[in-house]
């Protein structure tokens, strides 16, 4: 038998999954790693933590599965985007902890860049619809301006999954989907843009060679094979950025298909032969891992991670209870949230704890509970968070529908948030759209990475098998009464985004003790 391993390097940790040649997931293991926040707007992770999570999860996966290492023929990786891992000419890591996709430290570098290159032209060429400081090129410019000695030693700057690919094979490359988040990649030309590189002042040589997501970039080095417990002949394909791997795993293998991803961050994406670009509301676009296609999306940065923040700060007793009982703390949290009625008794939560998206009036928009009073209890707080996360994504869905009116009234939901029956119903009622859950929920990005490996290794001729793997397990239809409640709340939520953005801009200027700006 032939088997595949997929690594899904998410914001919260790495999930290793074992697939058979038909695309069935036989086993999976998750290893968490931390994000640190050294200053306001700085979000960092340690590349060594990613590697150790890959090593540990591989060992546990092999222990779970009754397969021989020699039967694993290929590996594919999905990785969170906009990474900037600096390597010297020997491949050595130059920074122990590196900015991740949500890190916004490079605002000054973005402003300097746009004094040389018009921002609208840059967006229309790149499709980079996140706030500009998040994109890789500006973070590299920050390295240059703030850590010149380290910057002078840089030979390559690569992303999350490409760093793991390098540790696996010794080869430094990227794929089209990950390169499309560099900030200097031209979507329609399918290459780095020389004019944007010139405006950045960055040497083209530090950006990795771009290859297809299904291309075999090498076999495991003897050292990597020994550390992982795998055979040295195991091939590694380039893989892709999480957005695009998830699109593939979520059945977006044809034009017009849409999915909603629920994780630490969330997004709604449509697949098309041409990128959906709008200079005013700026959807973000990544090249698909499938040749000739694009994924255009709007996202919400702090959705699932807001729920995790509530878990860590307001539900420590539930964490302990789940540990004692061998249960899932999120199940306990949603059971408690269900005791609060729709609308959380007038309590509204804004989940933008990591900053505003391109749809927000300001990147300095931050999270808030609104209308909190002494009559509210923890069940209201929890339900308000779940509803606020759904409200934020309703804004996303409305913006996408304005660009593509053909988006239908059924939506496939994938990712960790799709597991909760209550949350799926809240989404259905808030979106006024039917939510579908299939047999592939949290496995979508991993399935996409595995599919890249399957095609690259010659086990699959193409990606058509993806449709056969999905089996519909649940359908949540909107309730008209609850939808009317949420429509009323949505009007307040929209206004609150404006007001909170203004407050965020003002608070940024405050010299608060213990708060870095």
Enumerate the predicted regions with their spans:
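Active-site donor-binding loop signature of nucleotide-sugar glycosyltransferases
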Residues: 31-33, 212, 478
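A generic structural motif
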Residues: 32, 100-101, 301
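Residue-level signal for inorganic ion chemistry
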Residues: 23, 46, 75, 103, ...
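Short beta-strand-loop/turn "lid" adjacent to the catalytic site in phosphate-handling enzymes
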Residues: 63-101, 126-136, 165-186, 209-212, ...
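Short, solvent-exposed cationic patches
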Residues: 46-53, 111, 117-120
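Active-site core segments that coordinate phosphate-bearing ligands/cofactors
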Residues: 5-6, 107, 114-130, 134-173, ...
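N-terminal glycine/serine-rich phosphate-binding loop of ATP-dependent small-molecule kinases
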Residues: 1-96, 153, 222-226, 230-235, ...
């Amino acid at each position: 038998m032939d088997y595949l391993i997929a690594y899904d390097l998410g914001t919260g940790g790495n999930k290793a999954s074992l697939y058979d040649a038909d695309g069935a997931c036989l086993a999976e293991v998750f290893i968490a790693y931390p994000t640190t926040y050294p200053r306001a707007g700085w979000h960092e992770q340690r590349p060594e933590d990613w590697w150790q999570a890959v090593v540990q999860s591989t060992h546990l996966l092999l222990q779970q599965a009754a397969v021989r290492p020699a039967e694993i023929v290929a590996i594919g990786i999905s990785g969170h985007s906009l990474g900037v891992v600096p390597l010297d000419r020997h491949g050595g890591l130059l920074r122990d902890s590196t900015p991740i996709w949500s890190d916004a430290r490079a605002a000054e570098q973005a402003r300097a860049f746009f004094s040389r290159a018009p921002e609208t032209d840059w967006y229309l060429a790149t499709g980079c619809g996140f706030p500009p400081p998040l994109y890789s090129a500006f973070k590299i410019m920050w390295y240059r301006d703030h850590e010149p000695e380290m910057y002078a030693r840089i030979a390559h700057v690569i992303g999350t999954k490409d760093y793991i690919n390098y540790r696996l094979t010794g080869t430094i490359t990227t794929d089209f989907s990950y390169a499309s988040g560099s900030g200097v990649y031209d979507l329609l030309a399918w290459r780095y843009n020389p004019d944007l590189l010139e405006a950045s002042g960055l040497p083209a040589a530090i950006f990795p060679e771009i290859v297809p997501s299904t291309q075999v970039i090498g076999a495991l080095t003897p050292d990597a094979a020994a550390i992982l417990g795998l055979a040295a002949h195991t091939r590694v394909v380039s893989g892709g950025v999480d957005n695009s791997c998830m699109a593939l795993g979520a059945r977006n293998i044809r034009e017009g298909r849409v999915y909603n991803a629920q994780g630490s961050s969330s997004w709604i994406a449509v697949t098309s032969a041409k990128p959906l670009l709008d200079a005013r509301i700026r959807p973000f676009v990544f090249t698909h891992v499938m040749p000739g296609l694009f994924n255009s999306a709007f996202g919400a940065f702090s959705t699932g991670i807001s729920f995790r923040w509530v878990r860590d700060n307001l539900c420590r007793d539930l964490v302990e209870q789940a540990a004692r009982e061998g249960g899932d703390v999120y199940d306990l949290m949603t059971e408690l949230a269900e005791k609060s009625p729709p609308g959380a008794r007038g309590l509204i939560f804004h989940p933008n704890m990591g900053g505003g998206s391109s749809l927000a009036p300001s990147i300095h928009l931050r999270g808030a509970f609104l209308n909190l009073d002494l009559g509210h209890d923890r069940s209201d707080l929890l339900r308000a968070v779940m509803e606020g996360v759904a409200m934020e994504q309703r804004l996303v869905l409305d913006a996408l529908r304005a660009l593509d009116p053909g988006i239908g009234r059924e939506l496939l939901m994938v990712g960790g948030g799709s597991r909760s029956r209550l949350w799926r119903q809240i989404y259905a009622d808030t979106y006024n759209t039917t939510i579908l859950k299939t047999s592939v929920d949290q496995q979508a990005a991993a399935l996409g990475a595995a599919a890249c490996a399957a095609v690259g290794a010659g086990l699959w001729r193409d990606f058509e098998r993806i449709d056969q793997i999905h089996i519909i397990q649940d359908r949540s239809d909107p309730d008209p009464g609850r939808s009317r409640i949420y429509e009323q709340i949505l009007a307040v939520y929209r206004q609150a985004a404006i007001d909170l953005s203004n407050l965020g801009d003002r608070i940024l200027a405050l010299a608060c003790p213990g708060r870095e700006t």
